[in-house]
Amino acid sequence: MKSHHSHQHSHPVTSLNSIFIICIILNLSFVVVEAGIGFIYHSLGLLSDAGHNLSDVFSLLLSLFAFRIARHRSNRHFTYGYKKSTILVSLTNAIILLIAVGGILIESIYKLRNPEQISGEAISWTAGTGIIVNGITAWLLMKKQKHDLNVRGAFLHMAMDTLVSVGVVISGLIIIYTGFTLIDTFISLLIALIILLSTWRLLKESMCLSLDAVPSSIHINEIEKMISNIPGIQSWHHLHIWAISTTENAATVHIVLEDIRQMENIKQQLRHKMHEMNIQHITIECEACPYICNEPHCC
């Protein structure tokens, strides 16, 4: 007799998809305007910010794609479905941002050697519009970013972009009142530094999740203590915790029971407590004591 247990879980992502679409439209429209004005007035600050905003649009598109493909049902080949695509997209987004930083640095060095005349008024007005666009986008993502690495990355990008636009406005005003056009290049270097700092955590966490490290939202010491404190569990071993996606986690553990007749009750307790600790997919292997093994937590 065949037995099949599906691990497919339905999560409402329609509202998040709509938010991503609105953010993409807003930012893509602004990129076209900002890049056009940057070319006309030879502003590296505007061009570098437009390039970064374009990478944000691409990142938002990738995130939207990942959320949609993650909804596909599991199959015989992808038994967890395509949920891990959200982690891969998060890692891709971090790499794209690092490439953008490299491009800004190269262009900044060129502009330092070959300075050009820049219109402070055009820079200020365009970047001022950017504050509004990026601010609205960050606000739309703010409520959704607490429990999802992809959304948090997008939110941080937009929040940083808002600050960057503030910096570009300041450089435009300095050019208007002092004529010091090199400030535009210095602002570009500052933009690159801000992007690098905001990307580092995203890159680090994405790489860790890609390598099946314990997610940062999971406190493994608390889980180990919780397992040890459940009555009827004499010892445990082979505890493994990893991320299935940027929002779902899984765990497997072997527990050694004092009384095998209490197996179902203990498994139910352990499963419930792990759910409370943000682990959604749990596999528990039960063994009767005495059980001989060399793991540190065994009896």
Ranges and model annotations:
Residues K2-I21, Y41, G45-L47, G51, ...:
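Alpha-helical transmembrane segments and adjacent TM-loop junctions that form the membrane-embedded core
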